[in-house]
UniProtKB/Swiss-Prot annotation:
Chain residues that bind Zn(2+): 302, 306, 317
Requisite cofactors: Zn(2+)
GO biological process: proteolysis
Domain of life: Eukaryota
Protein keywords: Cleavage on pair of basic residues, Glycoprotein, Hydrolase, Metal-binding, Metalloprotease, Protease, Signal, Zinc, Zymogen
Disulfide bonds: none
Gene name of the encoded protein: plnC
Xref: Pfam families: Peptidase_M35
Signal sequence coordinates: 1-19
Name of this chain's protein: Penicillolysin
Cofactor remark: Binds 1 zinc ion per subunit.
The protein's enzyme class: hydrolase
MF (Gene Ontology): metal ion binding; metalloendopeptidase activity
Endoplasmic reticulum among keywords: no
Length: 351
């Protein structure tokens, strides 16, 4: 890991503090995907429940950043996503990060998949979107709603797709310098040290610790899954050990302007780049003192798991927070970033 920045700007006391419920099966968001033109897609998100819902739209439809709104598949293999994955706070959420839909109401979002996916080879692809979106009351995440879409099959004109401007621009390496903010550098160095400790302890627990505790977070006790989880955590620990080498570049501050309100940090997985936001330092404690609470160390661990250069494939954000993460299947949990952060926190605190 290379520790750097850009010189120009481009809680409660019990184990279940953050164990939020999944909303009723009668409540859900239905997503309908359709083609507007070429690689431009329209998503219509409908609240199919009987009550109004307010949810976090970061990393979801209506987010204006180049986040992963759909998965793109070619011959059953997912095409590499070249955008950002953002981690946000669970409490004190501002209105600009939230969307409210009344019962039966819809929101529409249009986006171009070619801005975050290389489709220059053209041909047949399939789009789909599913997961869990955090529900908010009084500015705090209190539960989760499932969402799912239709499969949208497209035949892409590669020549047209290649003319679409990419969302992420190449970084100018000449603007890069050693992290010059002494306070942030010190905080991140401490977070990296804590990440090494937490990841190594969690890796040991994954290989030979409590089977029931492992199953709580990864929904299986199979030796093969335990080995994969342990290997990914060991890779995270190795990456966090050095500030001058490794597969990732870690910025003390925002590099591309994606640190909006409530965003703690983000990763560009296709480029193995991680960046912290201002509230990583002002909102998060160095280490959590309660189970499933967010902190700097597990946020850094979470971001490292997104980077395929650390361990391939990189993780996704399939379930955010304890309740959503522990509601995933085993195959989903092993690819869910927060499952690793939550498990490491649990092992550290004896949750």
């Amino acid at each position: 890991m290379r520790f750097t920045t850009l010189s120009t700007a481009f809680l409660a006391l019990a184990q279940n503090v953050y164990a939020f419920p999944i909303e009723s099966d009668l409540s859900a968001l239905d997503v309908t995907l359709s083609q507007v033109s070429d690689t431009r897609i329209k998503a219509v998100v409908k609240n199919t429940g009987a009550e109004n819902v307010t949810f976090v739209h970061l990393n979801f439809f209506r987010d204006s950043a180049p986040v992963k709104k759909v998965s793109v598949y070619r011959e059953n293999n997912e095409v590499v996503f070249d955008g950002i994955k953002r981690r946000f706070q669970l409490q004190g959420l501002a209105s600009e990060s939230l969307t409210t839909l009344e019962a039966g109401e819809v929101l529409e979002d249009e986006f171009d998949i070619a801005t975050t996916t290389d489709l220059s080879s053209g041909g047949a692809i399939t789009l789909r979107s599913n997961g869990l979106v955090p529900v908010v009351k009084d500015g705090a995440v209190t539960g989760y709603l499932p969402y799912s879409s239709n499969d949208l099959k497209l035949n892409i004109d590669g020549a047209k797709a290649s003319t679409v401007t990419k969302a992420l621009k190449p970084l100018d390496r000449r603007t890069k310098e050693t992290c010059s903010n002494a306070s942030r550098k010190s905080a991140l160095e401490k977070a990296l040290s804590n990440t090494v400790k937490l990841a190594n302890a969690a890796a040991t627990a994954a290989r030979s610790g409590s089977a029931s505790k492992f199953s709580e977070y990864f929904k299986t006790t199979s030796s093969s899954t335990r080995s994969v989880v342990a290997a990914r955590l060991e890779a995270v620990a190795k990456e966090a050990q050095s500030a001058s080498s490794g597969s990732t570049t870690y910025y003390c501050s925002d590099t591309l302007g994606y640190c909006e309100t409530n965003v703690l940090a983000y990763t560009l997985p296709a480029r193995n780049i991680i960046a912290n936001c201002d509230i990583y330092y002002s909102y998060l404690p160095a280490l959590a003192g309660t189970c499933h609470q967010q902190d700097q160390a597990t946020t850094t661990l979470h971001e490292f798991t997104h980077a395929p250069g650390v361990y391939s494939p990189g993780t996704d954000d399939l379930g955010y927070g304890y309740s959503a993460a522990t509601s995933l299947s085993s195959s989903q949990a092993v690819l869910n970033a927060d499952s690793y952060a939550l498990y490491a926190n649990a092992i550290n605190l004896g949750c």
